[in-house]
From Swiss-Prot:
This is Protein NEN3. Keywords: Exonuclease, Hydrolase, Magnesium, Metal-binding, Nuclease. SUPFAM superfamilies: Ribonuclease H-like. The keyword Magnesium applies.
Length: 506
């Protein structure tokens, strides 16, 4: 595809956002309903161009339940819009070869764009670099705005309500970045005063690393002398460096601590002179989910159950009083809060024996890294349904400061026409170990009725072993925690299995 928008350098930053229809069935794709983007001058932070359009999905069944949203997007409006194939050239022209920016775009919008181009058989646009303001601001701004969603950040800075329309949201995104950068710029100017007043601690100055060094302002400096480039004017580069270094937005987007840099390999370090001269901001690929995962590991969690010992931290059916279940907001990370579920004053963890597997593991469903989702569906007994319904009620009704438009997903799954056959999804965790995928949940097999637990080692090389052990009709003892989540316009309670005992019949 030809790219005609803007100059040959394509130096503008493309802030973009998608509005989508949330899948109603497992494995169903997201349907893009709206695309919006602005091109921003990286030196003056001035909006140079804007574009937005509603998008009609090729599969209209994906919007069969779409009603008028608070944002104003309606089914009739979507039905009268162009399909993605009809706007693909325009989207490509806006995005290809530019720096991409947006909120949670690495995990969501970038993936949806690539899927949309793949669906129509075209090569997707490729970014020069990517700036994900969710992960970036979570690192640099310290989560002072709670969950760091766009709505929470806008409320924090008094920018009004999030419109949930693509063009409005990308403009708000730019304003949020400006505000955050200004606060960080002011704090860096008088750190002894302003950082003491803040609940965010300033980051340590980076130290020397291989393939170059990191200087005080956090920008990678090439170990190669600037004189080796015949096109570089050292004097002008010095002046440009001073100007750009002091720009709060550029400082925010290029600063990188030693701990950040060590989290991923940089195969081709960018020469600092080229970086400043052309204002090509380095790619930021740190995953906000990894940061949250680290915090969760440091936070209180149920001890790993022994293979045969009684697991006292996990409550059984006769040990739970529905009236004692409550949800509460507890301190999480750098001043933010998260929801936690309790039974009286103890974190709520459950064990349930002889649950029958309704649907086993399916390789059709994978996570963002391409790993199979090791989830199973089990029949939910009446007593378990009562407890999970009470958990849903406590969590769903907990007042929070940050507004959300997430759809609440009940923990107990009740299909139309099968109300008397409720089920629940158990999440078996998977962990990456290089090229291998390991099962993070402790899995055992046990011969009934008096057998001992035998550890089942599971990796991507022998995933069939776990699949064949969890066929429909199999009975399992499950020990699980209840973890509230709110992600990609969906919220609910995840049943995260810590230990799973597969019961074998003699």
């Amino acid at each position: 595809m030809a790219s005609s928008l803007g100059g040959d350098e394509r130096s503008e930053i493309a802030f973009f956002d998608l509005e989508t229809a949330v899948p109603t069935k497992s494995g169903e794709p997201f349907a893009i309903l709206e695309f919006g983007a602005i091109l921003v001058c990286p030196r003056r932070l001035e909006e140079l161009y804007s574009y937005s359009t509603l998008v009609r999905p090729t599969d209209l069944s994906l919007i069969s339940t779409l009603t008028k949203r608070r944002s104003g997007i309606t089914r009739d409006g979507v039905l009268s819009a162009h399909t993605f194939s009809e706007i693909a050239d325009k989207v490509y022209d806006i995005l290809h070869g530019r720096i991409w920016a947006g909120h949670n775009i690495i995990r969501f919008d970038c993936v949806r764009i690539r899927e949309a181009f793949a669906e129509i058989g075209l090569s997707p646009p490729e970014p020069k670099a990517t700036i994900d303001s969710l992960s970036l601001l979570s690192q640099k701004f310290g989560k002072r705005a709670g969950d760091m969603k766009m709505a929470s950040l806008a409320t924090y800075f008094g920018l009004g309500d999030q419109a949930h329309r693509s063009l409005d949201d990308v403009r708000m995104n730019l304003e949020v970045v400006k505000y955050c950068a200004t606060v960080l710029f002011l704090e860096s100017s008088v750190p002894d005063i302003l950082t003491d007043m803040s609940w965010f601690s300033p980051r340590k100055s980076p130290r020397t690393r291989s393939n170059g060094k990191l200087v005080a302002n956090g920008v990678r400096e090439s170990s190669t002398s600037s004189s080796s480039s015949p096109k570089t004017d050292p004097s002008s580069s010095s002046v440009d460096a001073t100007i750009v270094k002091n720009h709060p937005i550029v400082s925010l987007l290029t600063e990188c601590s030693e701990s950040d840099a060590s989290s991923y390999d940089i195969e081709d370090p960018i020469d600092i002179t080229t970086l400043i001269g052309k204002l090509r901001i380095g790619t930021l690929q740190t995953d906000a989910a990894e940061e949250a995962k680290t915090v969760r590991q440091q936070d209180e969690s149920p001890p790993s159950p022994d293979s045969d010992a009684k697991d006292e931290s996990f409550l059984g059916v006769n040990e739970v009083s529905v009236s004692s279940i409550r949800a509460s907001l507890v301190p999480f990370y750098r001043g933010s809060l998260r929801m936690k579920l309790f039974h009286n004053d103890t974190p709520l963890h459950l064990c349930w024996h002889s649950l029958k597997v309704r649907f086993g593991i399916s390789r059709k469903f994978v996570d963002h890294a391409g790993r199979p989702k090791l989830n199973i569906i089990v029949d939910a007994p009446l007593d378990l349904c009562k407890i999970l319904d009470a958990v849903d009620a406590a969590a769903h009704n907990l007042p929070t400061d940050s507004s959300t438009n997430s759809d609440w997903r009940p923990t107990v799954i009740r299909k139309e026409g099968f109300a008397n056959y409720p089920t629940a999804r158990l999440h078996i965790s998977s962990e990456s170990n290089g090229d291998d995928t390991l099962c993070g949940t402790q899995v055992y097999q046990k011969e009934e009725p008096l057998g001992t637990n035998q550890k089942l080692d599971v990796s991507s090389d022998n995933l069939e072993k776990l699949e064949s052990a969890l066929l429909p009709g199999t009975l399992v003892d499950a020990f699980f925690s209840l973890e509230p989540y709110s992600y990609q316009q969906m919220a609910g309670i995840r049943l995260a299995v810590k230990k799973l005992v597969i019961l074998l019949k003699k």
